[in-house]
């Protein structure tokens, strides 16, 4: 799984966990090997026919609901070739890397314990626990707030201690837009930058004349 010498260095994609209020970086999780493919699905947020107004047919309620799916591979083979330089890999295999990804879907144990303590003293309303805001980073033009909606882990090989040493991780993420994050938040500012970059990139696309479609006019 080592890179061939002489090849240009490829940027790593990954997930950045930040404080949702200030944007301060709490943790960066880079993919060991970038996925070969990534599937993005956009579901339009239109007004819909239920409004009864035909003029609403071309109106949008907001940005589409964008879902990103990818599979990432983890492999400890290279590190295990140099055990003295990678003692944690020898002892735990891929457990630390997998745990970092899994913790995106967990609240902190401290928050859980605080709610348990509040429930024990009869607190009626317990506030849902706030997690760090996850950002999906895939190059300079795609840094976007997301919610990890599904995480699947397939452990494919193990060492003698049954630590996983090769695994495949399936990630499904929903892009969080203005409707999800609210007006005036740090995450909304980041999404708007993502939205505006899309507009800029769309403006760089080639202008195609009607003749290319075999027509001279629409009506």
Whereabouts are the PLM-identified features?
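Acidic, Ser/Thr- and Gly-enriched intrinsically disordered low-complexity segments
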Residues: 1-219
């Amino acid at each position: 799984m080592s890179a061939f010498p002489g090849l240009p260095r490829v940027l790593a994609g990954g997930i950045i966990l930040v404080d949702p209020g200030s944007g301060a970086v709490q943790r960066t999780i880079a993919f060991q090997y970038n996925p070969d493919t990534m599937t993005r699905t956009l579901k339009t947020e239109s007004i819909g026919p239920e409004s009864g107004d035909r003029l609403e047919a071309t109106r949008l309620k907001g940005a589409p609901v964008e879902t990103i799916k990818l599979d990432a591979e983890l492999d400890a083979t290279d590190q295990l070739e140099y055990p003295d330089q990678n003692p944690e890999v020898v002892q735990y295999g891929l457990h630390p890397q997998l745990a970092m990804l899994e913790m995106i879907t967990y609240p902190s144990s401290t928050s859980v314990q605080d709610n348990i303590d509040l429930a024990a003293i009869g607190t009626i309303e317990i506030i849902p626990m706030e997690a760090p805001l996850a950002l999906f980073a895939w190059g300079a033009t795609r840094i976007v707030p997301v919610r990890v909606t599904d995480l699947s882990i397939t452990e494919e090989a193990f060492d003698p201690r049954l630590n996983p040493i090769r695994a495949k991780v399936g990630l499904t993420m929903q892009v969080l837009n203005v409707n999800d994050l609210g007006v005036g938040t740090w995450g909304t500012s980041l999404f708007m930058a993502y939205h505006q970059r899309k507009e800029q990139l769309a403006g760089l696309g080639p202008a195609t004349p009607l003749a290319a479609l075999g027509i001279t006019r629409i009506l």
